[in-house]
A protein has these predicted regions:
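SAM-dependent transferase fold signal centered on methyltransferase-like domains
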Residues: 1-163
Length: 163
């Protein structure tokens, strides 16, 4: 997948990690920064993004919705990948996660942990509809200790008509 992406952006607060990313992807825009802050403030990099790598050490969904709502320049077809660390908290405290409120009302609190990847897919699709985008492909898997991390990829088209 990365070989198809000629330009992109990566954010991370960890200096060592972001230095490694910059060496691996020299043609990308790479920031040691709080990505949510940058997205909310419509970071201007001078290029249209086509690949975004989100690694928030918690919920990634706030980042996705803020990016979709933003005026940040992007290609008509772009990719978001995320390393989402929220799943562990969902075992006992899903109801505390504000961004999951709509999903909890639809699917129930007890469904959130065991079906989290499907919930993320559904929520990103909802965000896309709300912001005039189309989710064209979604995939992911659980990993890490006790499968409490979630890695996913979302391919999104800009300006698609909501169904």
């Amino acid at each position: 997948m990365l070989s198809r992406c000629k330009k992109g952006v990566a954010f991370d607060l960890d200096r060592e990690k972001i230095t490694w990313v910059a060496k691996q992807r020299p043609e990308w825009m790479v920031y040691q920064a709080d990505s949510l802050y940058c997205i909310k403030n419509n970071i201007d990099t001078g290029l249209k993004f086509n690949f975004i790598d989100i690694d928030p050490y918690g919920s990634s969904l706030e980042y996705v919705i803020e990016f979709l709502k933003s005026s940040i320049e992007r290609d008509d077809h772009f990719i978001i990948v995320a390393n989402d660390g929220l799943r562990d908290k969902l075992k006992i405290q899903a109801w505390e996660v504000k961004i999951l409120k709509k999903a909890i009302l639809k699917f129930g609190n007890n469904s959130i942990y065991k079906s989290y990847l499907g919930i993320v897919n559904w929520m990103i699709n909802e965000f896309c509809i709300e912001t005039n985008h189309e989710l064209s492909r979604f995939g992911g898997y659980y990993c890490g200790k006790n499968n409490n991390m979630t890695h996913y990829i979302a391919e999104i088209k800009k300006g698609a008509s909501a169904p």
